[in-house]
């Protein structure tokens, strides 16, 4: 069996159905004896260029180990699913299990978000401090 990296983009109006699509695709891979090394749901993201007058899409990344028959079946499923805007299947030299850069960036943003909340809480205090000075003048 060979190792593959699969990225597919789903129509933003079909974002609710992404979980079912992932289940269906991973199920077909595991039923055929393949393994899934990495599965990342990147969520809705801005695309680099519009596709069918759409500017956003729901991205999913999978690293799998499977046979050629399964990959042909998966490619056919992508082709006939109208919700899948684009897909890319690349053969890799080995299994990739570490987090992708996209997911690391998403987690870093999530860690920084509480800091922004702290700043927003502090900002009114500074304004309150400025008000008594203005009243003294």
From Swiss-Prot:
Function: Binds together with bS18 to 16S ribosomal RNA.
CC per GO annotation: cytosolic small ribosomal subunit
Highest classification ranks of the organism: Bacteria, Pseudomonadati, Pseudomonadota, Gammaproteobacteria, Vibrionales
Protein name, per record: Small ribosomal subunit protein bS6
Region (Disordered): 96-137
InterPro entries: Ribosomal_bS6 (IPR000529), Ribosomal_bS6_sf (IPR035980), Ribosomal_S6_plastid/chlpt (IPR020814), Transl_elong_EF1B/ribsomal_bS6 (IPR014717)
UniProt cross-references to PANTHER family, sorted A to Z: MITOCHONDRIAL 28S RIBOSOMAL PROTEIN S6, SMALL RIBOSOMAL SUBUNIT PROTEIN BS6M
Annotated organism of origin: Vibrio atlanticus (strain LGP32)
Stored HAMAP family: Ribosomal_bS6
Biased composition (Basic and acidic residues): 104-137
Family: Belongs to the bacterial ribosomal protein bS6 family.
